[in-house]
């Protein structure tokens, strides 16, 4: 029996199936052919839901196509099932669970991002409740990251969430390396400097944003060549700069800043869309220096918004050669080589040569570290490495060139 199935406006396919098979089997076959998830899809006939326990033969008398009512059917019209698959299989790190973090995580979850890791040290306070959609009065005193992760997953169960309640500097490096994009929703310069260092050194795209009252800014940073978010700051004023803050509650020794839900929503929406652009196009960009036409390229300049005076402008900021992060003497002036290695290769002969080839290193290896979800462990010889590593872990390798320069490489075990 041949059955026509359709995602309206996107694609229509014909499926041949034994009439004795169940409607549920039809759904599985159709979803597999279209590259969408069966558990997020319903089958409709003339607008009414089909029972999946019925036989396919029940459709013989109908000439209308069976509609696949997929959760993200409207998004397929723009980027197709392959584009949606990229979102469903990606991890995004959200640094900061305040006002921006609430809105960005909501948007990413609604778009179908598969996993969101949320990091924040702070607790929910009363002034947060009026501006942050996932915080309620009963959450007062609880950790922001944990509350946001729990409530996002509760509302959008198809999104995996996890929380890290601690300082960014203490977070295992693996959690950064696992992230396709880092979204910055931080309220202090010191943490933003650290985050930018990590993103530049390990070439992780960073979408940074800030708000002050009815003004805001958004910057997309594609390392290593872009102007980094810290290039704006004069080197001799780092200790005094607060800049455009993300409106989490101010520390006791800092003045509170004005915050409005309208500017929060606007800036966060732009930040989320920039994240989607990077997820869809970063591989193509790194290979061809072109961004996909369907989703567009991220901001190449810093976007400034002024809702009070209705002003919106992009400003090009040149790289600062004296930048504390990416400058000639910056803390992240050198970037690490990144590669992948099948885990089985470590159990073959000459693992040292195998690792060198994977890391594109031909110098003397000084130290090898294991980076996993528990943190960093120094490895003493290859027998130790073989016993300790798991698929998905990383090896961080430091090597020394003949001229004395140190090189760093990151190898993911797949």
What are the functions of these language-model segments?
Residues 21-22, 28, 33-34, 66-414:
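Adenine nucleotide-associated cytosolic modules
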Residues 11-12, 49, 403-408:
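Short, solvent-exposed loop/turn motifs
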Residues 19, 28-49:
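Short loop-to-beta-strand transition segments
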Residues 47-69, 385-388:
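Eukaryotic mixed-charge, acidic/polar low-complexity intrinsically disordered regions
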Residues 10, 36-38, 61, 404:
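A cross-taxa feature marking solvent-exposed loop/turn segments within ectodomains of secreted
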Residues 1-16:
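Eukaryote-biased recognition of intrinsically disordered, low-complexity regulatory segments
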